[in-house]
């Protein structure tokens, strides 16, 4: 199978040596590959099959849109109706709704990742269904063990980029430890009427302490209802059923659930969760701890950190790439540290209660920084 002329699955051994290997074919990994290809051949390994399916609301904020404007025009074919939605804070129990000026481009996430693959140059190979089993570093480079169709292969590279998400194998193999993760569930509901053109972020109090928030977004003929639960939540599917009953009671236009997806998302709680890498290994996106701890937005963080890693590789000697990358993402790390200071208040019952009394223009302004 090919996408954009690139290898996406193979039963034969691929090349034994690449200049750069990227683990993970999401926005972080693909942007790293795009930039790193300026130095030499790149291999992108994705544990899942391709085209990749990521459980996500598919919302591109203004930072993500600005980033992509410098790469390539977003194809209209992957944009869903309504084309743009604004973020809206919803205190469900008190019927408080506060629309903001934060505006998102509404895309199909599966098609978005597929499109990013098509942007890669000819010296990048993308191979799906190829989980990495481990790797070792030495003074000359990195050697990975990759499993494809039941057979293990060794691949050698000068630099390795870990872009394999919140449960990163690359991060764990480095000995940096895992970052805790939210449990996320997302229902695809057949629409039986129109939803308002908002990306609603919902707080409610009847689900229990394990519940963080829900979101609703219209997506063409579908209504997506996602919920985020804190780490170690027991029986999350039962809690999502309860959440869906409450939401449907007020929004009957949300028809039957046709599909439910389960996934995890990074749960950043400390500046120590941010790890750019070690040696010749660079960590990007959620693997490196790059994600908003206050809003849960990750796509813009993924693309920017991935591009910074790829640019550092392209412009540096292999031994110097990590230092260049760390410098290049220092402003992103500072942004996350600033948001972490707000987090205890935002997650507290008092914080959520007081937000209902804050004038809407102030909520809108604060939201821009989250």
Question: Where on the chain are the PLM-derived regions?
Answer:
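Predominantly flavin-linked oxidoreductase catalytic cores and closely associated redox partners
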Residues: 121-254, 273, 289
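N-terminal FAD cofactor-binding segment of flavoenzymes
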Residues: 48-88
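Short beta-strand to alpha-helix junction loop
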Residues: 98-118, 231-241
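N-terminal Rossmann-fold NAD(P) dinucleotide-binding loop
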Residues: 29-30
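Extreme N-terminal leader/targeting segments of oxidoreductases
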Residues: 1-20, 39-40
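FAD/FMN-dependent oxidoreductases across multiple families
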Residues: 134, 231-309, 319
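C-terminal helical "tail/cap" subdomain of flavin- and related membrane-associated enzymes
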Residues: 311-370
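Glycine-rich FAD pyrophosphate-binding loop
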Residues: 21, 25, 34-56
């Amino acid at each position: 199978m090919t996408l954009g002329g690139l290898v996406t699955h193979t039963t034969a051994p691929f090349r034994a040596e690449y200049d750069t290997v990227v683990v993970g074919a999401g926005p972080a990994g693909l942007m790293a590959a795009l930039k790193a290809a300026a130095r030499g051949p790149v291999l992108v390994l994705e544990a899942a099959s391709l085209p990749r399916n990521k459980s996500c609301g598919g919302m591109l904020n203004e930072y993500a849109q600005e980033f992509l404007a410098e790469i390539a025009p977003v194809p209209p074919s992957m944009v869903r109706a309504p084309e743009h939605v604004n973020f809206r804070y919803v205190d469900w129990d008190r019927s408080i709704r506060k629309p903001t000026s934060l505006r998102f481009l509404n895309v199909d996430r599966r098609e978005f990742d597929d499109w990013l693959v098509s942007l890669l140059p000819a010296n990048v190979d993308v191979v799906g269904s190829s989980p990495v089993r481990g790797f070792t570093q030495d003074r000359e480079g990195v050697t990975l063990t990759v499993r494809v169709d039941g057979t293990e292969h060794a691949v050698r590279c000068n630099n390795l980029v870990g872009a394999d998400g919140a449960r990163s194998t690359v991060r764990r193999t480095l000995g940096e430890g895992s970052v805790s993760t939210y449990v996320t569930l997302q229902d695809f509901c057949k629409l039986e009427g129109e939803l308002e053109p908002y990306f609603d972020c919902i707080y409610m109090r009847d689900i229990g302490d394990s519940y963080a928030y829900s979101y609703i977004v219209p997506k063409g003929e579908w209504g997506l209802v996602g919920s985020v639960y804190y780490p170690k939540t027991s029986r999350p599917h039962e809690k999502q059923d309860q959440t869906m009953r409450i939401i449907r009671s007020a929004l009957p236009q949300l028809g039957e659930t046709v599909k439910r997806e389960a996934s995890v998302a990074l749960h950043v709680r400390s500046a120590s969760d941010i790890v750019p890498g070690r040696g010749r290994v660079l960590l990007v996106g959620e693997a490196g701890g790059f994600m908003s701890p206050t809003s849960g937005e990750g796509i813009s963080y993924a693309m920017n950190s991935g591009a910074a890693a790829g640019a550092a590789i392209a412009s540096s000697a292999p031994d110097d790439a990590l230092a260049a990358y760390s410098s290049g993402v220092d402003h992103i790390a500072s942004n996350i540290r600033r948001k972490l200071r707000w987090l205890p208040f935002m997650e507290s019952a008092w914080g959520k209660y007081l937000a209902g009394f804050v004038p809407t223009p102030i909520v809108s302004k604060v939201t821009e920084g989250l």
